[in-house]
Design a protein with these regions (language model features):
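Alpha-helix-loop-beta-strand connector modules within alpha/beta enzyme cores
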Residues: 141-145, 150-152, 207-230, 275
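Active-site mouth loops of central-metabolism enzymes
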Residues: 95-103, 162-179
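Histidine-rich, glycine-flanked metal-binding segment
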Residues: 35-41, 54-93
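Divalent metal-dependent hydrolysis catalytic cores, especially in the metallo-beta-lactamase
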Residues: 108-131, 144-152, 189-199, 227, ...
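Beta-rich carbohydrate-recognition modules and glycan-binding surfaces
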Residues: 451-622
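Active-site neighborhoods of metal-dependent hydrolases
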Residues: 179-204, 253-368, 438-443
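Acidic, glycine-enriched loop/beta-strand segments at the rims
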Residues: 33-37, 50-61, 74, 353-356, ...
């Protein structure tokens, strides 16, 4: 989770706050089940090439009994009737770690399908984490990845991390550090995550902790024998974090090339780094996950909302200093200096997704100088060791049978990790066949949606021309106000018809109000629902673009387009708005949709705080 260059902040489920304000629901934790009756979680895998988390073993057997690895060797003898799996020519790996995620909904189920058996969450709702732990302890979470979490992060009032709709405490003074950390541990945090980030990498300015506060929090975590990790996006804050004795960095910077002494400094302090190259790439305007959607080894298991998010990237602002080459260079230098590198994705930010994105992260780590085997280490034994999870991350007797079987040899081609044959969590096999069937069913439903009739009255494409003296729309549920009030914000908006529209027309829709600084991700604007009710999908696939006229007051404005297949996370287009009327056309293709399941169009103001007023006219789909 990092500040982005155009949408002000990367998201956990961030933009779903907007959908909540207009009545949309999001996916929630699905009830898990224990192992099916008769599933003993006992079997033997024979003749596999085994990467045991440290080295490769040729033609090796691995026996599993009641969810634990029993023996690793050759020609193992097992009890009569034991299930045997021939893995000749295949590679058996420890289940993978994703060492930087933000977890909610069905993320852990999704992760397991792609071979991730443990997620290290770096900020989520601690109540969600507690529910997962409860299920895990009861043996009811076998078909979802295991979870460790930082819970609530450490930030300042109005700092990064306060913008996601969760009411979280903030730190006001170094003197409060110990009590603050103790409160997080009482909530169940497994480690402490700190935000040291002022937005300067992308030309923004937000409040952040002081270096003294960062050092105090790190010391407080160490007093309780807990790791303290730090979110950074610039080399300046990365260096400051290490000097303050952070155990690790959960991002790498992109603003400048690494200084000659930076890697040595990190090594000297025995720190580790989770670079999150996938989201770093996405932050520069490149959809890091697009190649995953195109990969036939993965695509049958990727549902439509996930595919849509993987194809997204953060629009790049001119003032951004982010350069992906700097991130690669920093990882290369850190690795050469012997700094432990951990694979993490920052899912589910744009360009990423739970589970599947770890395979892109491994590929990028190899691009940054790790060998394929070293990349495998970064997702197995290294995070297990660093985070003290000594019951996993390797294939050895007595450890959890968290396993990933792939066709081919990932030690020579890291993309082989995508060619998944089977995944087990504590010996229970993940339901990949069921997941594939669900995706296929969804594709059929999408095809049916594309064949459904468009909304009545939409044939001409005209949404509103405001020539009748009202704010009415020609089809759909019409226009409504959307603000950040349901996310704890205090922004306001009003929509009304006013005379004198674009090109001398009779009228237009005026949107005015106030952007508050009560939450960091503030919004207020006008929302159009093309379906008969808010967020009801409408088939508008016969249209290819949105055309409209707009004028404003010099503030930044955005167009957000929502689709059902986009998982209710919108595509975002910055709008160059002046005080003069201007016609703008935005192609559906630029928004990552074909229009078959359009659920909403939002014209919105954002930061900085203050009053705003803009107008739109002659809005149409064409």
């Amino acid at each position: 989770m990092r500040i982005t260059s155009s949408v002000p902040f990367r998201v956990l489920a961030a933009i779903t706050l907007i959908t909540a304000s207009i009545g949309c629901s999001v996916r929630v934790l699905r009830a898990q089940t224990a192992a099916p009756a008769g599933e003993t979680r006992t079997f033997v895998i024979r003749n596999a090439r085994v990467f045991d988390g440290e080295k490769l073993l040729s033609s090796t057997d691995v026996s599993v009994e009641k969810g634990l690895i029993k023996v690793v060797g050759k020609n193992l003898k097992v009890a009569p009737g034991t299930k045997e799996i021939d893995a000749s020519g295949d590679t058996l790996l420890p289940g993978l770690f994703d060492s930087h995620t933000h977890t909610w909904g069905n993320a852990l189920e999704q992760a397991l399908i792609f071979g991730v058996t443990t997620e290290l969450d770096m900020f989520s709702d601690y109540k969600f984490d507690a529910e997962v732990r409860k299920r895990e302890a009861a043996g009811q979470n076998l078909h979802a990845a295991d979870l460790r979490s930082a819970g609530t992060l450490v930030t300042v009032a109005k700092g990064h991390g306060t913008e996601y709709g969760l009411s979280i405490p903030t730190l006001a003074s170094p003197a409060d550090a110990q009590s603050f950390v103790d409160a997080r541990l009482a909530e169940g945090s497994d480690y402490i995550k700190i935000i040291y980030e002022d937005g300067s990498a992308i030309g923004r300015s937000i409040p952040t902790l002081t270096k003294d506060e960062v050092a105090a929090v790190i010391s407080a975590a160490h007093n309780r024998k807990k790791l303290a990790v730090v979110h950074i996006t610039t080399q300046f804050f990365a260096r400051g974090s290490i000097e303050a004795n952070a155990d690790g960095l959960v991002h790498i910077f992109e603003d400048v090339p690494p200084a000659p002494d930076f890697a040595a400094l990190v090594k000297q302090h025995h720190a580790f780094v989770i670079p999150t190259l996938t989201v770093d790439e996405s932050s520069t305007g490149v959809a890091s996950g697009e190649s995953l959607v195109a990969d036939q080894r993965l695509s049958p298991y990727i549902d439509a909302p996930t595919a849509a998010n993987l194809k997204k990237a953060f629009p790049r602002r001119a003032e951004s200093k982010e350069n992906f080459a700097n991130a690669l260079a920093a990882v290369r230098a850190l690795h050469a200096s012997g700094v432990p590198i951990l694979a993490g994705t920052d899912a589910p930010n744009p360009g990423t997704a739970h589970g599947v994105s770890i395979h892109r992260e491994l590929e990028l780590l190899v691009e940054a100088g790790l060998t394929p085997t070293e990349a495998l280490l970064s997702a197995t034994s290294v995070p297990a060791r660093v985070f003290g999870l000594n019951d996993r991350g390797r294939i050895a007797p007595g450890l959890r049978a968290d396993l990933l079987l792939v066709k081919g040899d990932p030690s020579t081609d890291i993309t082989v990790t995508r060619n998944i044959l089977a995944v087990w969590k504590t010996g229970a096999e993940a339901g990949r066949a069921e997941a594939r069937a669900a995706v296929e069913k969804e594709k059929q439903e999408i095809a049916a949606a594309k064949a459904s009739p468009p909304p009545a009255g939409s044939e001409s494409g005209l949404v509103s021309n405001f020539e009748d003296g009202t704010t009415a729309a020609k089809f759909g549920a019409g226009w409504s106000v959307s603000t950040d009030s349901t996310a704890g914000g205090k922004s306001t908006a009003e929509i009304k018809w006013f005379a004198s529209g674009a090109e001398g027309s009779k009228g237009a829709l005026q949107i005015s109000g106030m952007i508050s600084d009560a939450v960091a991700y503030a919004w207020a604007g006008a929302f159009f629902s093309p379906g008969s009710a808010p967020f009801e999908p409408a088939n508008l696939s016969s249209k290819k673009a949105i055309r409209f006229w707009i004028r404003g007051d010099g503030r930044p404005y955005r167009l957000m387009v929502f689709t059902k297949s986009g998982g209710y996370m919108p595509a975002v287009q910055d709008l160059a708005v002046t005080t003069e009327w201007k016609e703008i056309v935005v192609a559906f293709s630029a928004l990552g949709t074909d229009g078959h399941d359009l659920t909403g169009i939002l014209f919105t103001a954002g930061g900085p705080p203050g009053s705003f007023q803009f107008a739109i006219d002659n809005v149409r789909l064409e």
